[in-house]
UniProtKB/Swiss-Prot annotation:
The gene is AGXT. The keyword Mitochondrion applies. SUPFAM superfamilies: PLP-dependent transferases (SSF53383). The modification N6-(pyridoxal phosphate)lysine is found at K231. Its EC number is 2.6.1.44, 2.6.1.51. This is Alanine--glyoxylate aminotransferase. One of its GO terms (cellular component) is peroxisome. Belongs to the class-V pyridoxal-phosphate-dependent aminotransferase family. The lineage of its organism: Eukaryota, Metazoa, Chordata, Craniata, Vertebrata. Substrate binds at R382. It comes from the Eukaryota.
Length: 414
């Protein structure tokens, strides 16, 4: 073997001699994983949890298209079309509208990293896990975080928020439009105007609500809005949508310190996404194939129309609510006007372990629902109807599966 390597080294020349010598003096100590020598196998699942949701055929097909270079003109054209799609689904004319190469958490972090500076006052509506996450990130950035904490299922009134604005004089308020951990739909009308009266920016999480409930970024005075790809848009997780008002942009561009993240620096991302009128420069390699799928998800929602999508989700949720109540289950959010159409929460029925019910549905029927998350853990079951999954047929499937689960899962005697 060594003679063969020596001959190979001589034949390839001095530049190749180094790696030939390296191969001769080292051994592979880690074998190829046996699991990777088998074909990939994916089970069939009906994803009726809080996300991700199933992919429609058009979105799946987009994910199988051939790769383009991330700086090709055709890729930039796709990015421009995505930006227009975001402006439509957000109902905004903001030029600073783009995609973050990362999940909804990444968009939240991008918003906070670019807007907040050390010492800034940050008012956070914490009525579920997403407010908790926003407060956590704010603390890491050195902001003075002021949580307005409510139990799962709670929401915020204009009066409550105004009291917080007057007391803490924040530069930024965070609210979750669709709190998927508790199933609450937070009203937004009037909050933007209220924030601006106190010289405060309004940041809204619409990951679970976008496309499923009415949302008007410009008309509702929302300064920063973000969402995800894997809910109503029915695209793979891993990309997120983000838009900034001119007021928010001015705050970012006039900050005294650099944002703590290069990857999430909006000034660079604005150039990458063609938002600053300058020739595009390399910043990072975008997930090109994921952008294909996101583009198709936005296209499907655009073809359907926002108002039709909102109506579809409202009707599917109402049908689900009726079927659940017919089973004797209690909806966690009492006020119908505050129920998130895309994610319904049900109080865990007395005597049952929520994990038994979730496991029964996935193992017996291949249907995913989930338990609570963060503060709602152990309190609720969560059922999602998003995008192509928001149908009466799926409601019938999941409620019949729940009926059987309640008959077969162990129940403690009280």
């Amino acid at each position: 073997m060594f003679q063969a390597l020596a001959k190979a080294s001589a034949a390839l020349g001095p530049r190749a001699a180094g790696w030939v010598r390296t191969m001769a003096s080292h051994q592979l100590l880690v074998a190829p994983p046996k699991a990777l020598l088998k074909p990939l196998s994916i089970p069939t699942r009906l994803l009726l949890g809080p996300g991700p949701s199933n992919l429609p055929p058009r979105t799946m097909a987009a994910g199988g298209l051939q790769m383009l270079g991330h700086m090709h003109k055709e890729t930039y054209q796709i990015m421009d079309e995505i930006k227009e799609g975001i402006q439509y689904v957000f109902q905004t004319r903001n030029p600073l509208t783009l995609v973050i190469s990362g999940s909804g958490h990444c968009a939240l972090e991008a918003a906070l990293i670019n807007v907040l500076e050390p010492g800034d006052s940050f008012l956070v509506g914490v009525n579920g896990i997403w407010g908790q996450r926003a407060a956590d990130i704010g603390e890491r950035l050195g902001a003075r975080v002021h949580p307005m904490t409510k139990d799962p299922g709670g929401h915020y009134t204009l009066q409550e928020v105004e009291e917080g604005l007057a007391q803490h004089k924040p530069v930024l308020l965070f609210l979750t439009h669709g709190e998927s951990s508790s199933g609450v739909l937070q009203p937004l009308d009037g909050f933007g105007e209220l924030c601006h009266r106190y010289k405060c920016l309004l940041l809204v999480d619409s990951v679970a609500s976008l496309g499923g409930a009415p949302l008007y970024m410009d008309q509702q005075g929302i300064d920063i809005l973000y969402s995800g790809s894997q809910k109503v848009l029915n695209a793979p997780p891993g990309t997120s949508l983000l838009s900034f008002s001119d007021t928010a942009k001015n705050k970012i561009y006039s900050r005294k310190t650099k944002p703590s993240s290069f990857y999430l620096d909006v000034k660079y991302l604005a150039n990458l996404w063609g938002c600053d009128g300058q020739p595009r420069m390399y910043h990072h390699t975008t997930p090109v194939v994921s952008l294909y799928s996101l583009r198709e998800g936005l296209a499907l929602l655009s073809e359907q129309g926002l108002e039709n999508s909102w109506r579809k989700h409202r009707e599917a949720a109402a049908y689900l609510h009726g079927r659940l109540q017919a089973l004797g289950l209690r909806l966690f959010v009492k006020d119908p006007a505050l129920r998130l159409p895309t994610v319904t929460t049900v109080a865990v029925p007395t005597g049952y372990d929520w994990r038994d019910i979730v496991s029964y549905l996935i193992e017996r029927f291949g249907i995913e629902i989930t338990g609570g998350l963060g503060p709602s853990t152990g309190k609720v079951l969560r059922i999602g109807l998003m995008g192509c999954n928001a149908t009466r047929e799926n409601v019938d499937l999941v409620t019949e599966a729940l009926r059987e689960a309640l008959q077969h899962c162990p129940k403690k005697k009280l």
